[in-house]
UniProtKB/Swiss-Prot annotation:
This is Serpentine receptor class delta-40. Its main location: membrane. It comes from the Eukaryota. It is a multi-pass membrane protein. GO terms for cellular component: membrane. Belongs to the nematode receptor-like protein srd family. The lineage of its organism: Eukaryota, Metazoa, Ecdysozoa, Nematoda, Chromadorea. Keywords: Membrane, Transmembrane, Transmembrane helix. It is found in: Membrane. It comes from Caenorhabditis elegans. The chain crosses the membrane at residues 12-32, 42-62, 95-115, 133-153, 189-209, 243-263, 273-293.
């Protein structure tokens, strides 16, 4: 397919992706606020955190519509979205925000697993314990954000670089060039290793906590009803799928990315979808949460008149 066909496909895709993802995310946020189980406690904070960062991810993705020209050295980053009308440094900054938002939403799912395990163990949450766990799992993100700030300052904000991009984009209409990507600088290499390492490691860490949760609720020391155990199993199943989605989407497109860099092959799918595919979990995650968190699913059934209000079980029963 030619470049024009990819642009036509994305011209249709981005509005649908934005509208559908935003509606489902806002619906989920409403349910988190007003229909969460009483004992969900801080888990709903992490569900909300995941949803908010995925909204940012969707907004940035659709407003930027990046394309990576991997045949150029260094890699040329173009914007075909509304950001093309702004200065290049803003587009480059939004690219870093895109990565951070994806990183944060993925890490939030992992932290939800950790605190779910703590709840199953019936551990009391002290402020120091909560703060310690959150800081521990956010260390890679904090380090990544520091690297991204350094990259923006060094590679986008200097006056001579800004003037260079103003000249390049003076007559740009279809797209603007917003930056250059390379792994030859220390901050960019560190940032790449942090993000790619977390994408690979997070699903397996989540799976580790999944097994511990299931072993715990199936042990003789966990004195709760079969129904309650079943609800926890369903909740954990949904989290597991969410945890593995980034890995499923990232690995193929990143493999193609490295192939294009090493061989200098032009593959238009890779160029146009390199930043689209990693955003797709934001499309699927809210639907998974709406389905696998029982009170949310039942509330949706009530709205669709599939189930009557009187049939809804108390929302206090999901987590404890």
């Amino acid at each position: 397919m030619g470049a024009d066909i990819y642009r036509d496909v994305l011209y249709i895709f981005y509005p649908i992706f934005f509208i559908f993802s935003t509606i489902t995310q806002l619906m989920l946020i409403y349910l988190i606020f007003y229909h969460s189980p009483t004992h969900l406690k801080m888990l709903k904070v992490f569900l909300l955190n995941t949803s908010l960062f995925q909204i940012i991810l969707v907004v940035v993705s659709c407003s930027s519509q990046f394309r990576m020209i991997t045949t150029a050295i260094p890699i040329e980053l173009r914007s075909y979205g509304l950001l093309r009308y702004l200065e290049a440094w803003l587009g480059y900054t939004m690219y870093q925000v895109l990565q951070t938002s994806a990183f944060m939403s993925g890490m939030s799912i992992l932290i939800t697993f950790v605190f779910k395990y703590e709840l199953v163990r019936q551990i009391e949450f002290s402020k120091s314990r909560v703060t310690g766990i959150i800081l521990l799992f956010h260390m890679p993100i904090i380090a990544s954000m520091v690297m991204e700030v350094i990259m923006v300052i060094n590679q986008s904000l200097p006056n001579e670089i800004r003037e260079q991009y103003k000249f390049l984009n003076a007559n740009a209409e279809e797209y603007s060039i917003v930056g250059a990507l390379s792994l030859k600088t220390v901050p960019s290499l560190i940032n790449f290793l942090l993000i790619s390492g977390s994408v690979v490691a997070s699903p397996f860490i989540s799976f580790f906590f999944r097994e511990k949760i299931l072993r715990r609720i199936n042990s003789q020391f966990y004195q709760h009803s079969k129904w309650k155990k079943s609800q926890i199993q369903v909740f954990v199943k949904g989290l597991t799928i969410q945890a593995f989605l980034p890995l499923i989407f990232y690995v193929p497109v990143f493999g193609l990315y490295f192939y294009c860099i090493l061989t200098h092959t032009e593959i238009l799918f890779q160029q146009y979808f390199m930043t689209v595919v990693p955003c797709l979990p934001a499309f699927f995650d809210p639907m998974l949460t709406l389905y696998f968190v029982t009170p949310y699913r039942r509330r949706l059934k009530i709205w669709m008149r599939i189930e009557k209000e009187s049939k809804v079980l108390p929302v206090t029963s999901l987590v404890k």
